[in-house]
Design a protein with these regions (language model features):
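N-terminal Rossmann-like FAD-binding beta1-loop-alpha1 element of flavoenzymes
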Residues: 3-30, 370
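Short, solvent-exposed loop/turn segments at secondary-structure junctions
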Residues: 12-13, 35-37, 99, 158, ...
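Glycine-rich FAD pyrophosphate-binding loop
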Residues: 22-47
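Mid-domain catalytic core of redox enzymes
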Residues: 24, 219-338
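Dinucleotide-binding Rossmann-like beta1-alpha1 core, especially the glycine-rich loop
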Residues: 47-123
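General small-molecule cofactor/ligand-binding pocket signal
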Residues: 77, 211-215, 346
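Active-site/ligand-binding neighborhood in enzyme catalytic cores
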Residues: 90-92, 99-230, 235
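C-terminal catalytic lobe of FAD-dependent flavoproteins
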Residues: 318-371
């Protein structure tokens, strides 16, 4: 065999696997059907700004081994994710914390905020008269009450899923963290940041010295590619790997409307969520804020924004999020059963495992494999 590993997909799972294989003295060939490497982490430089072409990616972890690993490839900056929600022209800090409650009700102490939330939760509990929540709407109202739900959850969630909250299963929202402190840091993790110079630096570092082929569809000449190696690492759609034998898994996808604007600072923050149903996009990303902090944003006279629209996935579109309803979960279980019987194929990543992944757990999983 020509290679120890054939790796299908050069996203974070594939690239990290290739790096670890090479460190262990193994040979790899990495294929990607896109014209570039990096999967959804790919960035394009526009006017000196690294634009996240497939949506905002913010690295965060409490795992020191993973943090040291990525920083050994490329240095990360101090970016802290602190999104803002825009509801009908009023701004609210996220995640839900004392700043949010002050903006919503004018409360200034944790005791006042707690009382307000408990009062609204009790109203919902009373209306359910002892039965459990039947859908996402009831679940959210039980967790945080009507004001937070109506202004910051309902419209955003309905846009994300393309259906009413009353028609979505309750399990989608198991908990909604409420912080009784003035803290806009979205993540609880010890470490977070963005690679200095963008995510391409991370991917290029992981794939340094590895043979790669872009613009190459594994399924077009499957037998040829499979013949090059004893072991295959597959990071694409698991249902496609098995020829959709049991039917197609469903996804949500995201459409991006990118705009280069002749102003140095469009919204003053990397991420602004638009939480009312009537605004068609879910959020606007202003990319320069991921790597330029404070007044430094004015050193670059232009800015790039991306409006994100969540839509139903159809063939030919990029699959983003798995739809974890009963039908898809049981369908995936059938494919997983086939995958578990494979000796020569490793399935890894969000498409091959049909699950939503943050970046750090993907790296953890690969490091674990090589231990």
């Amino acid at each position: 065999m020509k290679y120890d590993y054939l790796i299908v997909g050069s996203g974070l799972y594939g690239a990290t696997f290739a790096y670890m294989a090479r460190q262990s003295g193994k040979t790899c060939l990495v294929l990607d059907k896109r014209p570039h490497l990096g999967g959804n982490l790919y960035c394009e430089e526009i006017e000196g700004i690294n634009v996240h072409k497939y949506g905002a990616h913010i690295f965060h972890t409490s795992n020191k081994e993973v943090w040291n690993f990525v920083n050994s490839i490329v240095e990360f900056n101090r970016y802290t994710n602190s999104p803002v929600a825009n509801y009908k022209g009023k701004l609210y800090n996220l995640p839900f914390n004392m700043n949010t409650f002050y903006q919503m009700w004018g409360v200034t102490t944790p005791e006042q905020a707690y009382a307000k939330i408990e009062e609204q939760k009790a109203e919902m509990a009373a209306s359910l008269a002892g039965r459990g929540p039947q859908n996402l709407e009831e679940q959210a109202l039980l967790l945080v009450g009507r004001d937070i739900y109506e202004k910051l959850i309902k419209g955003y969630t309905e846009k994300q899923w393309g259906r009413a909250c009353a028609d979505l299963p309750a399990f989608i929202i198991r908990r909604l963290p409420v912080r009784m402190v003035f803290d806009n840091n979205y993540f609880n993790d010890t470490y977070q940041g963005i690679p200095i110079g963008g995510y391409n630096k991370l991917i290029d570092g992981l794939l340094d010295g590895v043979e790669t082929k872009t613009g190459t569809d594994f399924f077009r000449e499957r037998e040829y590619w499979e013949g090059l190696s004893d072991k295959i690492v597959f990071t694409g759609k698991i249902d496609e790997f098995y020829g959709y034998r049991f039917g197609k898994l469903e996804y949500r996808t995201v459409r991006f409307e990118e705009e280069l604007i002749n102003t140095p600072n469009f919204q003053g923050n990397a991420v602004v969520n638009y939480t009312e149903r009537e605004v068609p996009y879910t959020r606007i990303i202003e990319h320069k804020h991921f790597e330029m902090f404070g007044q430094k944003v004015y050193d670059c006279p232009k800015t790039v924004i991306s409006k994100e629209y969540s839509t139903e996935w159809k063939d030919g579109m990029e699959p983003y999020y798995p739809v974890n309803d009963e039908r898809n979960v049981s369908l995936y279980a059938k494919y997983k059963e086939l995958a578990d019987r494979e000796n020569r194929v490793v399935f890894g990543g969000r498409l091959a495992e049909y699950k939503y992944y943050d970046m750090a757990p993907i790296i953890e999983k690969v490091l674990e494999y090589w231990k």
